[in-house]
Amino acid sequence: MLHLIGFDKLYSYNMVKLALLEKGVPFTEV
């Protein structure tokens, strides 16, 4: 909760990753 901006970016990143996984798109973590 201290770094709201960083948390928001991480949240968005996770949402994108979940969306790709749902579509069955291969996703490699960087």
UniProtKB/Swiss-Prot annotation:
Catalytic reactions of this protein: RX + glutathione = an S-substituted glutathione + a halide anion + H(+)
Predominant place of localization: cytoplasm
Enzyme class: transferase
E.C. no: 2.5.1.18
GO cellular component terms, A-Z: cytoplasm
A Gene Ontology molecular function term of the record: glutathione transferase activity
Subcellular location per the Swiss-Prot or TrEMBL entry: Cytoplasm
Signal peptide start and end residues: none
UniProt entry keywords in alphabetical sequence: Cytoplasm, Transferase
Quaternary assembly: Monomer and homodimer.
Protein's job: Conjugation of reduced glutathione to a wide number of exogenous and endogenous hydrophobic electrophiles.
Family of this protein: Belongs to the GST superfamily.
Name the UniProt record assigns to this protein: Glutathione S-transferase
Source organism of this protein record: Pseudomonas fluorescens
